[in-house]
């Protein structure tokens, strides 16, 4: 028998990487009541890549936008106080190493930081947060999951797994903990089959739900994030997906667990399975961050190191996504961006009158969009995320004259620009519908 030493070395290197990595627009609806013409206009704000301000409207519903072994501790950036500002009065963010990253406010959807966030990336195991969200939305935690032969055999010895066996039974909640904390790939497969009957049906559900959450360039082919050329997303899209997860209390309850979790013996094994969360910013871990509320790690050779993290301080909840990163650097980058975000931004609640004062007939009236209607527009009260030295008075709203309004079966769509201090902070897609359209919609308050 001949021993392939090169193959053995490659296997060891791959295993070390996996051990090392801990893993084997703003879009909100703005209701505007039209005094004449009995039309309702919906604005879905989609923040561009340089956007920082966000708006969260009370009494509204989101809809998809129409328009990814040796521990080395790095020194954090100095973010103990508010950082300097650029020539437009905008906070200057810390330098990071991750190739693609984004920092958003989980409540308003405001984009506080963006680095090539629309670049196509492989998400690796961060995919599992969407698998978890769909499971919570479609199952009870006490339902019994039976592992199929396909699910049990879907992993190799070097993949993250918990050794589940064909025919083994666990509760949905136990499988969720195994997937989100330990990153067990066969458990993601089993949940997909339990929810939808097959992996292919589940991935269709994943792609549809991702769009509903605001993803623009995402396509998933599996429930775990194992590499596939057609399994991709962007940091921006993953932040939108993570926002849906962070706003689900049951998801946060499971994902924020920093103590050990044990799956007791089952019908196929007499041995209990005990494990901890692989996210190293949780309490008691190497990169402990006191405001960390969970998240998900990921790694494949093709994706590099990936990371989704939730954090909360005072009244602000932030989400950070780092893709195309290194083993330890993703945690350092995330911590520095969180510190910078908490130090430099604030949330303010405004009255409808405050926002309505931004509207002028010149900004909104355009015969190409509204035809014969003479509009009287009103906005609900809102929460905004802005740099600490800015106010709602710094925000301007204008109709984009370079965008030609489009029509789809009599429903017109136009575009607004939101700016502050000469920065384009957002874009709004205006949809105009008739009273019949309004009556048919169950999503409107």
Where are these regions (language model features)?
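Active-site-adjacent loops and short helices of periplasmic peptidoglycan-processing enzymes
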Residues: 53-236, 240-249
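Domain-terminus/edge residues, biased toward the C-terminal soluble/receptor-binding domains
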Residues: 215-216, 229-232, 236-237, 242-445
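Membrane-proximal envelope biogenesis segments
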Residues: 46, 58-83, 89, 106, ...
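Gram-positive cell-envelope targeting signals
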Residues: 1-62, 445
């Amino acid at each position: 028998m001949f021993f392939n030493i090169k193959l053995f070395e490659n296997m060891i290197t791959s295993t070390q990487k996996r051990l090392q990595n801990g893993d084997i627009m703003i879009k909100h609806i703005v209701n505007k009541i039209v005094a004449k013409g009995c039309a309702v206009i919906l604005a879905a704000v989609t923040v561009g890549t340089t956007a920082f301000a966000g708006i969260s409207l009370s009494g509204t519903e989101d809809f998809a936008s129409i328009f990814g072994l040796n521990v080395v501790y790095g020194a954090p950036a100095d973010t103990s106080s508010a950082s300097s500002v650029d020539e437009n009065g905008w906070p200057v963010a810390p330098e990071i190493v991750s190739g693609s990253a984004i920092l958003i406010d989980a409540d308003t959807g405001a984009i506080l930081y963006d680095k090539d966030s629309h670049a196509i990336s492989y998400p690796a195991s961060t995919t599992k947060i969407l698998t978890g969200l769909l499971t919570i939305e479609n199952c009870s935690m006490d339902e019994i999951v039976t592992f199929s032969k396909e699910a049990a055999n879907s992993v190799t010895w070097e993949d993250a797994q918990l050794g589940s066996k064909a025919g083994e039974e666990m509760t949905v909640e136990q499988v969720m903990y195994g997937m989100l904390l330990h990153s067990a790939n066969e458990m993601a497969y089993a949940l997909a089959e339990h929810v939808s009957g097959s992996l292919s049906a589940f991935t269709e559900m994943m792609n549809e739900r991702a769009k509903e959450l605001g993803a623009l360039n995402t396509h998933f082919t599996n429930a775990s994030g194992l590499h596939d050329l057609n399994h991709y997303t962007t940091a921006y899209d993953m932040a939108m997906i993570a926002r849906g997860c962070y706003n689900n209390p049951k998801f946060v309850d499971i994902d924020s667990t920093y103590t050990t979790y044990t799956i007791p013996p089952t019908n196929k094994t007499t041995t209990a399975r005990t494990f901890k969360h692989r996210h190293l910013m949780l309490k008691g871990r190497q990169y402990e961050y006191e405001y960390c509320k969970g998240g998900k790690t990921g790694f494949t050779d093709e994706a590099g190191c990936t990371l989704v993290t939730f954090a909360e301080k005072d009244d602000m909840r932030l989400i950070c996504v780092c893709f195309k990163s290194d083993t330890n650097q993703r945690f350092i980058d995330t911590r520095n961006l969180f510190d910078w975000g908490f130090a430099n931004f604030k949330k303010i609640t405004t009255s409808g009158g405050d926002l309505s004062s931004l509207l002028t007939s010149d900004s909104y009236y355009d015969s190409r969009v509204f035809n014969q209607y003479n509009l009287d527009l009103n906005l609900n009260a809102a929460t905004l995320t802005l740099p600490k030295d800015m106010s709602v008075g710094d925000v301007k709203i204008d109709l984009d004259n370079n965008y030609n309004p489009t029509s789809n079966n009599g429903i017109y769509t136009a575009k607004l620009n939101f700016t502050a201090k000469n920065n384009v902070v957002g874009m709004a897609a205006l949809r105009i519908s008739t009273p019949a359209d309004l009556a048919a919609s169950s999503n409107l308050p």
